[in-house]
Amino acid sequence: MQASIESTGNLERRLTFTLPQERLETHVGGRLRELARTTRIKGFRPGKVPTKVIEQRFGQQVRAEAMEGLLRETFDSAVREHSLRLAGNPRIDQGETDFDFVATFEVVPDFGDIDVTTLSVVRATAEVTDADIDQMIENLRLQRRIWNPVERGAQAGDLVALETWSQAGDERLPADGVETGSSVLGSGVMFDQIEKGLEGLTKGEEKTLSVDFPAEWRVPQLAGKTVQVHVKAVEVSEPVLPAVDKEFIKSFGVKSGDAEQFRADIRTNLERELKGALMNRLRREVGEQLIAAYAHVEMPPRLVENEARSMLAQQVEQVRRSGRDPGQVPADAHQGFMDAAAKRVLVGLLVGEVARRNELRLESRRVSDTLRLIASTYEEPEQVIEMYRNDPQLMNGLQSRVMEEQVIDWIAERAQHTEQSLSFQDAIRV
């Protein structure tokens, strides 16, 4: 194979290689002959279509497919021959001839010795208690609450329907009329100064509150200012919670309406949530230790920038879902994610390197268990499992996640670690 490699940066390489023309022509010829035997074309007997006709119809497509396959095969062979380990996908450009190509790519940095036994990891532990189940049932009751209007003053837990307008200096917001809304006192949805000011307010009562708006507030006219907010309680309502009876239990999918089965199902769901939260805590803990130990290692610049752009894309999507205009996000906003992206790339490459050096293999049993766990959150688990198994992209994502968790566990088991006992609520507060 004709191939040469050169360094164009600390972690960037340029690979120049030539495709074997004879192999390409052999593959194209073989594929065209196969099509001549199997293709049905009006006016010709099966298997008797002239090669020229086949080439006219399919030659360009067959050659393009053969070129693409041989290009990938030749590139992969050259990478193995030169013992290169790529960080990200290559950019492959046409060379001087139709069979010459130049691939530019980044390689995994040299981490030197990776001794995970020097890391110090805090491993959180927690369990689901009866009190946690009781709290979840109370939360479910709150979800099904109804509101009963009252004539007394508003207190914590009450729903207050409001009309408001604000005065910021000489500017009134809105310029005409009022804004309407509602808030449950104590929920933290509104500023503390407003919530406290609403306490004791009765239906129809009005009040003016002095409110300090933060500098980053989304309404420029209010940001960083002390504003006079005029509020009127249109209605005050207290919550009425349903009894935990058979009908209530059945509404959450327990057909028997049995209270013990209801609690057992809640325990299963909470334990699943807890397992995920503890893994996220461990992933973050191990990641922070790896970053501290290997922050001096240079990361592939293009890989970091791609990660930063991916993080920005996630933020833009969040902005869009919130109803705001994603066009307000600056085009170069990804620069603000570069530090976080570099850390994420560092951890990802290190996890892959630990797996490679220690010959860690994906555990199919763990993949199956994780898939069943995911599927159990849906009404038709078997359909979800089938969907994953029939979708290579979904399965690849699942396998990558499981492999990462295996490596995180492997590192944590060998690192210096201490256990930290947490309550369920503290554990899931990641």
Curated annotation (Swiss-Prot):
Taxonomically, the superkingdom here is Bacteria
Look up and give the organism this protein is from: Xanthomonas oryzae pv. oryzae (strain KACC10331 / KXO85)
Q: Which reaction does it catalyse?
A: [protein]-peptidylproline (omega=180) = [protein]-peptidylproline (omega=0)
The stretch of residues making up the signal peptide is none
Q: What is the lineage of its organism?
A: Bacteria, Pseudomonadati, Pseudomonadota, Gammaproteobacteria, Lysobacterales
The gene it comes from is tig
Record bears the keyword Membrane: no
- Identify this protein by name: Trigger factor
Task: Tell me where in or outside the cell this protein is found.
Answer: Cytoplasm
What exactly does this protein do?
Involved in protein export. Acts as a chaperone by maintaining the newly synthesized protein in an open conformation. Functions as a peptidyl-prolyl cis-trans isomerase.
Q: Which GO terms describe its cellular component?
A: cytoplasm
Domain topic, free-text comment = Consists of 3 domains; the N-terminus binds the ribosome, the middle domain has PPIase activity, while the C-terminus has intrinsic chaperone activity on its own.
GO MF entries: peptidyl-prolyl cis-trans isomerase activity; protein folding chaperone; ribosome binding
Its transmembrane ranges are none
A biological-process GO annotation: chaperone-mediated protein folding
* Enzyme Commission number(s) from the entry: 5.2.1.8
Which keywords does this Swiss-Prot/TrEMBL entry list? Cell cycle, Cell division, Chaperone, Cytoplasm, Isomerase, Rotamase
